[in-house]
């Protein structure tokens, strides 16, 4: 049984003071981690505050990116080794904003995935198509190729504990949402891709999220789909009340 997974991605928002206010706002109101795993992905400058505040609570923490080297002359990059030493749990990689604005390639994302595992962290690996690709009927091939490239060289055991996230680029921050049926269709295809690359056990174990304008109003419908295990949530994860509602969608 895959534990549901509700993850916030704050992107380039909130300072440490606002992070502490958020933590105070959700304290004691998140479900037990055995029921729903809750995670907040925050900018690097907020992670010290986030990790300290999440300690002893069900909330887990994620960095929004890291580099594939542990240390060195890489000005402005975030070390996965340092993230582990800070007690961060997850790292989000392959987000369409990283691919689009910062020209990250499938090869970069694969190197990052390996560096994350080398440092005993866990990846949240994103994939998704543009509107042009969807309209051209290329969604399934494109998403499968992104997943295959990201997972190259990872063991089945590593993939089982990874989290994958389907984020159609046309539905991120646009207010457009893939219907629950559209999301389920692509997420099922991602699971089938994992089965083809590995085996059924691995495909049944890996958690796959949907991201793209997920909010309290649509989370229940998305979570009712058999292959959707959670949400990677942008804007709706920044408000404590909204995040609490998402996390407690089962109630």
UniProtKB/Swiss-Prot annotation:
Superkingdom of origin: Bacteria
Subunit structure: Homodimer.
Designated gene of the protein: tpiA
Binding site for substrate: 9-11, 173, 213, 234-235
Reaction catalysis annotation: D-glyceraldehyde 3-phosphate = dihydroxyacetone phosphate
Protein name as it appears in the record: Triosephosphate isomerase
InterPro entries with a match to the protein in the record: Aldolase_TIM (IPR013785), TIM_sf (IPR035990), TrioseP_Isoase_bac/euk (IPR022896), Triosephosphate_isomerase (IPR000652), Triosephosphate_isomerase_AS (IPR020861)
GO molecular function: triose-phosphate isomerase activity
Keywords, comma-separated and alphabetical: Cytoplasm, Gluconeogenesis, Glycolysis, Isomerase
Gene3D superfamilies membership: Aldolase class I
């Amino acid at each position: 049984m895959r534990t549901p997974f509700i993850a916030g991605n704050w992107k380039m928002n909130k300072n440490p003071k606002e992070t502490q206010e958020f933590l105070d706002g959700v304290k004691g109101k998140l479900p037990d981690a055995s029921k729903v795993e809750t995670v907040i992905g925050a900018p690097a400058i907020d992670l010290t505050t986030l990790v300290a505040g999440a300690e002893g609570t069900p909330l887990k923490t994620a960095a929004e990116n890291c580099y594939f080297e542990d240390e060195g002359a890489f000005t402005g990059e975030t070390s996965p080794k340092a993230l582990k030493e800070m007690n961060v749990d997850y790292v989000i990689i392959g987000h369409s904003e990283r691919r689009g604005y910062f020209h990250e390639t499938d090869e970069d994302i694969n190197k990052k995935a390996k560096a994350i595992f080398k440092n005993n962290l866990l990846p949240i690996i994103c994939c998704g198509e543009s509107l042009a690709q969807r309209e051209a009927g290329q969604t399934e091939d494109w998403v499968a190729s992104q997943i295959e490239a990201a997972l190259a060289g990872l063991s089945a055991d590593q993939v089982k504990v990874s989290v994958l996230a389907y984020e159609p680029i046309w539905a991120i921050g646009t207010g457009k949402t893939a219907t629950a049926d559209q999301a389920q269709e692509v997420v099922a295809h991602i699971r089938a891709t994992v089965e083809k690359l590995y085996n059924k056990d691995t495909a049944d174990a890996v958690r796959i999220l949907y991201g793209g304008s997920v909010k309290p109003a649509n989370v229940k419908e998305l979570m009712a789909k058999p292959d959707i295990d959670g949400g990677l949530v942008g804007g709706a994860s920044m408000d404590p009340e909204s995040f609490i509602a998402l996390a407690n969608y089962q109630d």
